[in-house]
Amino acid sequence: MSFPGLSLAKSALSSTIHRRPAVREVLTFTEQIARTAALSSAPRAAIEATRTARLDRVLAAARETPFYRDALDDDVVRRRDLSAIAPVTKAQFLARLSDTVRRGVVDEREMLAFVRAPERAGTLLSDNYLVAMTSGTTGQVGIFVNDVESWAETRAVTFARIFRQQLNTMDIARAIARGKTRMVFVVATGGHYMTALLASRVPAIGRMVLDSTTLSVEMPLPVLVARLNAAKPHILHSYPTVLELLANEAKAGRLHIAPDIVTSGSERLSLPAREAIRQAFPATQLVETYAATECVHMASSCAHGALHVNDDACILEPVDDEGRPVPKGAVSARVLVTNLLNLTQPLVRYAITDQIEVLDEPCPCGSALTSVRVHGRTDDTFFLQAHDGSFQAHPPIPLELIFLSVPGLLQYQLVHETQNALRVLFVVEKGALGAQVAALLDAKLSRYLIEHDLYESVRTSLEQVDAIARHADSKKVRQILSRVAPPGGVVRAAPEVRERRRRPRSER
């Protein structure tokens, strides 16, 4: 006997469940991580087939945005001819922010209000959209948005490729047998920063096997070391400059952890940093990632250390200054990125000022994914002298956090001009008051110096300018730039936060 009413009720219930963002996120993540793992060792034809299907999907989505509508006629879309689409810059994109999202999503006013509320970091805008901000390598703050399903796909590709060596029956069984895997992210917190969002928005199915903790990169090093010693992570992720500091703490006998995997991102992993990490954690697998807030899943390294582009999820076009493709083995002037996963705010041929080199020789790991080498992408570590004469190492990411979430700030550069003399150059948004922006920057910079016991010994100056010069060769804005050579003596960790009376600037 059939019960039509019961069938209709079941169908309605299923539809209701699938409309819930949390459910869609879990289902998409689970499906895509299996798909991505299979493609990691697939022949090139299978990768190209997935890439083509996703390109068709993202071009169709881009046509629904006012920003791309005119550039994507039927012929361009049918031929999948990316070369017929003019590259877009970050400035062009942000100038028409509301036009970059699909119809009926969110507008610029809603996005700006959301990112200016740091307490809402990790939550969803309109119960469906994840919003992140970045300054990237241009010094200009940008806002980017994903829907929950696009974000679940992004997470799945990112994690499946980073942990490609662990996605096998034996390693999965071993991980389950030992209980939850402890993963610690030492990253920028307190705002809508992509890596922190990657750490915090773990799907329910992931929380069954993963205990994820986020620690602020702004913590004084002794506090951070103590927290890591207590957490004893199996997996540790941070920025290369921070990982290098932590490696030195381990070699000095203060950091007592033995992670199975260390992953790095947001900065280029330099040879000195790589060597320091390997010396400090000789049994650890080191994985380098290449990512941007606009496209988190660009590349990750294999067991042989080669960076492999996630060709099934993004298209990277290395080009010269004139926008012409560069051959394999040549270093590009910039990269045109097409994100094949974000259907809410499609990015097609979006220019980032990174320099990459596509490697010609096949990788010993056997992967059919493209191998690349990233050049440049390095801000400086500042070595500041405390009042007792000792030096402190301050990596760039915590310094960059001083400048994010400042209303009215368009672009910035922090320069270590001479020993213990910092100079801030900044550009304000149209209509913003320079004096107000300067006052807020001064307060945030002073707070940082107080927290690191440097307020008495470091001089600062701020200057509003019309534009910030780009590097002559890389064409990038060096946001955190040091003109001071590293000290030859002992460098110690920044001290724990201490309460200090702030003297008026006129007394300094």
Please report, for each region that a protein language model flagged, where it lies by residue.
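AMP-binding/adenylate-forming catalytic core of the ANL superfamily
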Residues: L236, L336, L341-T344, V348-D453
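Conserved AMP-binding/adenylate-forming
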Residues: L269-P362
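Adenylate-forming
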Residues: S216-M219, V223, P233-R274, V287-E294
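Hydrophobic beta-strand positions
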Residues: P318, V337, L384, A469-R470
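Nucleotide 5′-phosphate-binding alpha/beta core
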Residues: M1-M133, Q140-A173, R178, A230-I235, ...
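Residue-level signal for inorganic ion chemistry
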Residues: A62, T134, M183, L236, ...
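AMP-binding/adenylate-forming
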Residues: E149-A152, T158, R182-T241
